[in-house]
Amino acid sequence: MNRGIPFRHLLLVLQLALLPAVTQGKKVVLGKKGDTVELTCNASQKKNTQFHWKNSNQIKILGIQGSFLTKGPSKLSDRADSRKSLWDQGCFSMIIKNLKIEDSDTYICEVENKKEEVELLVFGLTANSDTHLLEGQSLTLTLESPPGSSPSVKCRSPGGKNIQGGRTISVPQLERQDSGTWTCTVSQDQKTVEFKIDIVVLAFQKASSTVYKKEGEQVEFSFPLAFTLEKLTGSGELWWQAERASSSKSWITFDLKNKEVSVKRVTQDPKLQMGKKLPLHLTLPQALPQYAGSGNLTLALEAKTGKLHQEVNLVVMRAAQFQENLTCEVWGPTSPKLTLSLKLENKGATVSKQAKAVWVLNPEAGMWQCLLSDSGQVLLESNIKVVPTWPTPVQPMALIVLGGVAGLLLFTGLGIFFCVRCRHRRRQAERMSQIKRLLSEKKTCQCPHRFQKTCSPI
C-alpha cells in the first residue's frame, strides 16, 4: 500500500510535466488569403533525416522517402512544398501557396521521433464594392476569418485617419486625401498580419479654386484630376452663374474618351476654348465684368454612379479715371475679409476698405495702384496713371500750338487795330474835307451880300 502511493504521485508528476511541454511546442502563425506561408520544423541535428507533415486529422501532406519528396492525399497536395536545399541543415519547413481560409488548421511535423504543432490561421480582407470610389461615397472592408477566431482590425488611411473594428469596417464619406494605400493590421493571439489595400478616390485635386484677373486679361481655368486611370471615359459640363445674371447657364459641354477631350457644344458669348488632352483646361479670351461669377464643372465617368464636381470662381478688377474721379472696382465672389485699396506709388494707401469699390476725388498726378488683399497678401493688382491738368514740363508740340494760337490772336488784334485806325483816319479826313468845303462855301457867299448892302440905295 505504502509503496503504491509514491508511484501514483510519481505518475501524476510525470503527466503534469508532460502537458505543458505539448502546449509550449504549439506555435501560432497568421497567414493572408492568396498569399504564401512557411511553417517551420527543425531537427536537433543538421542533417537530412526522415520527416512528415500531417494535418489535424492525421492525413499526410508531404514527407521524405529516401532523398525524394513525397505527398499524401490531402487537399494541399498541389499547393504544399518544402525547401530541399535546407534539408541538410536540419530544416524541414512546409510551404503552402495560394492560401485559403479553409487552410486554417493545426499542422503536425514529425521528425526525430518528436512532434511539433503549428496552428495556422488564414485571414482575408477585401472591399465590399469596387476599390475605385467617387468622393463622398462609403468604403466597407470585410474581414474573412476561420471559425472560432476573434480577431481585431485596425486600419490607417494615407491621410492618417485611424479606424478600428471587428470583422467589418465602414468608412463613410470618402475624401480625396483617403486615396492611396490603406494599411490594415489584423491581430489574433498576440500575433499580427498586415494587409495593404489600394483605394482610389475619384475626385478633382481641388474642391474649389478662384482666379483673379484684371479686366481684359486672358483667363485660364484648370481642373486636374486626383487620380490616374489607363482608360478614362465620360462626359462633362460647365455651368456658370455670372454675378450680374439672374440665372446660370451652360457654357460648354464635352466628351472624354481614353483621355481625349472633344467639345460637343459651346456658347458664343463667351466663346470658351478647351484643351484636347488631360488635364481638363479651359481658356476665356478676356476677363470682363459681365463674366465675373462662379461656375461648377461636373464630370460623369462611365460605369460609375454619381459625378465629380469642382467649383471655380472668377474675380475681375477694373481701375479707371472719369473726369476728376479715380475708381477701383472688383466683380465676382469675394470674401468680406478682403480689402480693396487705392494708393499712390511709393506712398501709403489713400483709401482702403473691405468693400468691392473705392474711389478718390481729384487724385494727385502719378502712378496709382489698385490692390485687392487678404491679410496683407496681394491677390490682384492693377495700375493706372493719372495725368495732371497742366502737364509739366510743357511738350514741344504744345508750345507750337500755343505759339500759333498766340500769333493768330496777335495778328488778328493788330489787323483789327489797324483797320479801326485806318477807318478812323478816313472818317477824320472826310470830316476835314467837309469842313473845308463848308468854309469855302461861306466865304464865297459873304461878298455878294456885302456888296448888295453897300450898293443899295438909301
Curated annotation (Swiss-Prot):
Glycans are attached at residues 42, 296, 325. It is found in: Cell membrane. It is a single-pass type I membrane protein. Its main location: membrane. SUPFAM superfamilies: Immunoglobulin (SSF48726). Palmitoylation and association with LCK contribute to the enrichment of CD4 in lipid rafts. Phosphorylated by PKC; phosphorylation plays an important role for CD4 internalization. GO terms for cellular component: cell surface; plasma membrane. Keywords: Adaptive immunity, Cell membrane, Disulfide bond, Glycoprotein, Immunity, Immunoglobulin domain, Lipoprotein, Membrane, Palmitate, Phosphoprotein, Repeat, Signal, Transmembrane, Transmembrane helix. A lipid is attached at residues 419, 422 (S-palmitoyl cysteine). One of its GO terms (molecular function) is coreceptor activity. Residues 1-25 form the signal peptide. Pfam families: C2-set, CD4-extracel, ig, Tcell_CD4_C. The modification Phosphoserine is found at residues 433, 440, 456. The Ig-like V-type domain mediates the interaction with MHCII. Forms disulfide-linked homodimers at the cell surface. Interacts with LCK. Interacts with PTK2/FAK1. Binds to P4HB/PDI. Interacts with IL16; this interaction induces a CD4-dependent signaling in lymphocytes. Interacts (via Ig-like V-type domain) with MHCII alpha chain (via alpha-2 domain) and beta chain (via beta-2 domain); this interaction increases the affinity of TCR for peptide-MHCII. CD4 oligomerization via Ig-like C2-type 2 and 3 domains appears to be required for stable binding to MHCII and adhesion between T cells and APCs. This is T-cell surface glycoprotein CD4. It comes from Macaca fuscata fuscata (Japanese macaque).
